[in-house]
Amino acid sequence: MIDSDGFRANVGIIICNQYGQVMWARRFGQHSWQFPQGGLDDGESAEEAMYRELYEEVGLRPEQVKILTSTRSWLRYRLPKRLVRQDSKPVCIGQKQKWFLLQLNGNDNNINLNSSGHPEFDDWRWVNYWYPVRQVVSFKRDVYRKVMKEFAPTTLAFQVNDTGRKRNRPRN
């Protein structure tokens, strides 16, 4: 679904573990890393698209995650001109994204990058919370910074255990 301004409706997914680390995935056959993301199908809500993409890209089912929060608004980024396909109608100049922060309820073994038979990613790892902002491709960096800043209080709050003390987090 491309809107009248040329932006494709899309969802972004940040999966965090009990230590506040986030899942960082390498695009199949490339050297670029990013969070899972994908477009909305016609008639699909952002949450429905998120669950579909979650399974297609990383093999996780709704019962294996918990939605902690989502962005208050849609965030946009423009594609570099070299990536804009002029032969498609309508022309897509970028993405508008609704982001979701998920807590992994299962274990790492539940993550399956080949669940759909057409993998988007060929590797993944847990990284510290702010690492992706510095490492993502430059045209997505501003959106990543905004999302991570918006989600930071939720991530910190969920890391606190029942005694009110922060859990020890491994270094990476």
Swiss-Prot record:
Coiled coil location: none
Enzyme Commission no: 3.6.1.-
GO molecular function, one term: mRNA 5'-diphosphatase activity
Pfam families, alphabetized: NUDIX
CDD domains listed in its UniProt record: NUDIX_Ap4A_hydrolase_plant_like (cd03671)
Domain (Nudix hydrolase): residue spans on this chain: 6-149
Superkingdom of the organism of origin: Bacteria
Any Gene Ontology CC annotation: cytoplasm
GO BP field: mRNA catabolic process
Locus of motif Nudix box: 38-59
UniProt keywords, alphabetically: Hydrolase
Stated name of the protein: RNA pyrophosphohydrolase
